[in-house]
Amino acid sequence: ALAMGADAIGCVFYPGSRRAVSLDVAADISRGVSGLGMMVGLFVNQSAEEVQSVLDRVPLHTLQFHGGESEAFCQQFNRPYIKAIPMSGDVNLTEAHLAYSSAAALLLDSVHAGQFGGSGQCFDWRWVEAGLNERVILAGGLSSTNVAAAITQVQPAAVDVSSGVEKEVGIKDAAKMKAFIEAAHAAAQDIKS
């Protein structure tokens, strides 16, 4: 993905996810991507000790929290962090930005019962308030077929994809990744021009 132009890759460390990777696999990945881009570690309601044990073995640049973690919890690791916000019609993004003012970004993701992201479903992009997009990473149901429209409408700082570039759960498809990255880059260029 990084060789194709992605800015970051993510490893899921939440044991309840079908996309979770072991510490050994993540350490191997980190050696392969060193210097190419950011490596992000995804956690869901895990203890500080669990997060730290990953950091002791895997050189993550950024942490991504998808559960009910507080700002104080997220900050304690002295790394940039992204806080996922499950999107529904009643989410107040101004309040979320204030509650996680130390976050590098807020990742806006769709809500699906019993899942913490990776559902493959979009949320209504009109819920993203104008002027709050500079620290927003848009996620939730994105693929090469809709990422350009998403970027054009929301104008987020970045986009995040998982299921939209998979052959099957946890297995990425190179052609889908390439198409997604090309569509995202083209849409971002159109906005800049």
Task: Give the label of every model feature segment.
Residues 135, 139-146, 151-164, 177-185:
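C-terminal active-site rim and adjoining tail of enzyme catalytic domains
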Residues 10-17, 21, 25-138, 142-146:
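Conserved anion-binding
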Residues 3-6, 33:
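A short, Lys/Arg-enriched amphipathic alpha-helix followed by its capping loop at the start of a domain
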Residues 6-17, 65-70, 112, 153-178:
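Glycine-rich phosphate-binding active-site loops on the catalytic face of alpha/beta enzymes
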Residues 1, 63, 106, 161, ...:
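Residue-level signal for inorganic ion chemistry
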Residues 23-32, 74-76, 162-193:
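C-terminal helical cap(s) of enzyme catalytic domains, especially alpha/beta-barrels
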